[in-house]
Regions:
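Basic nucleic-acid-binding interfaces
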Residues: 1-135
Length: 135
């Protein structure tokens, strides 16, 4: 079993897969922009108890795998990250402003999936069989 994270009251292992898309899928993410976006993540994430595991990008979106704590308010973190990274990326890479729609860098929407652990059906079966006598 993987090493679990813990705090004073619980033990947990919570992985997430986040996909953030550039507004209108504008093709503006290159290696330097992705690397800077990752650096910004590294600055903001610890304040929310988030640990980066993996980061990768395509020209119009990024994929991020991270761990979080049970108390982490994920939507607040994601919105804070998108706001700060949008502002900084547009300031530091002014050439991308020409390709964006108005001032928005990221789409308002995002995709957030849980990851890791046992498959849902295995957990469902485990819960359903609790309390049954074994022969």
């Amino acid at each position: 079993m993987e090493n679990m994270d813990h705090n004073a009251h619980s033990v947990y292992l919570m992985y997430y897969h986040l996909i953030m898309v550039v507004k209108y899928r504008r093709k503006v993410i290159n290696d330097p922009i992705s690397e800077r976006a990752k650096e910004i993540w590294g600055y903001i994430a610890p304040r929310y108890g988030i640990v980066l595991e993996e980061w990768n990008h395509d020209i119009d979106h990024v994929h991020v795998m991270f761990r979080a704590q049970p108390k982490t308010e994920l939507s607040k973190f994601i919105n804070a990250y998108k706001s700060a990274s949008s502002r900084l990326l547009k300031k530091e890479y002014p050439e991308i402003r020409e390709k964006l729609w108005k001032e928005a860098f990221w789409s308002q929407r995002f995709c957030l999936l849980t990851a890791g652990g046992a498959p849902v059906e295995v957990i469902r079966q485990y819960i359903e069989t609790q309390g049954e006598k074994k022969h």
